[in-house]
Amino acid sequence: LQDFFSQCREYAESIGWQFHVYWYGVGSNGGSMDLGSSFGSSKQDWLWKNNKQVVDMYMLNYDWGYSASSSASYAEQIGANPYTLYAGYDIQGNWLARGPWSTLKNTKMSIAFWGNHTTNMIYQNSSEFGSGDEAVQACYLEKQEQVFSGGNRNPAKRPAIKDGISSSSEAAMNNFHGIAEYLPARSVLQELPFVTRFGLGNGKTFRNEGKVTFGNKWFNVGVQDYLPTWRWWITDDSNNVPEDGIECGFTYEDAWYAGSALHMSGATKVSNVRLFKTNFDVSETDDVS
């Protein structure tokens, strides 16, 4: 199987295709079960064999903390990119607690969340504000922002790195440093024109040019817009986080198209809100509206 993966990769590259394999690293070179959480000579053939890359992602089992550094070093030693090793987090069973985040700060390694075969675990933990549709959605959006941007929901104001956060409660997540501590923003926005109306893909009504065309609840991820890269990167003119920073979020009470819109509220002296990371080739003839 290892040789098959390598051959598929080589052939795909020869015809301009991409071939990707993501592998949960609980097997030995020979194929027997090995639940150890380190990467070494007994497992190396699943990532790198005969000086060829075998899989694109090799996720370490969840107790990788004590061996993270040696696993990354061994990957480099055999010629592999250490960032093809992924530190696994079992967020279904342990939320964000099982692996030591502090270890990853100085380790060349990527991060993988294992959740559930059928359910987004952030959504699964989003009943804290109530069980109604709007309450669950509001909680889900906030927890998304805490997971990725940190407990303050602003990547420019991340809490210190903290291990052992086993609860998904708002209070516990207020102390989480966020994935932004480790992962710089990337962008799929490559070309103009670019249009977003901040539609989440659901709503209490459906609007077109601001007018209600369907008066009932709905959802359709196919009409979800591109949503902000950063939620919410807010600074003043000195790149400091303002004490009176504007509040940002989404509202279902109004929309230009679909079911939601960007909502900003509060009184602020200066709040610069960065929304999207882009790779546009902008010219003097382009317009922003």
Describe each PLM feature range.
Residues 243-280:
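Short carbohydrate-recognition loop motifs
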Residues 85-245:
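Substrate-binding cleft of secreted/luminal carbohydrate-active enzymes
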Residues 1-70:
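Chitinase-like catalytic core of GlcNAc-active glycosidases
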Residues 50, 75-81, 104-106:
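Acidic (Asp/Glu)-rich catalytic clusters
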Residues 67-90:
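Glycoside hydrolase catalytic-domain groove-lining segments
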Residues 30-35, 66-72, 95-100, 120-125:
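Extracytoplasmic/secreted cell-surface and envelope-processing proteins
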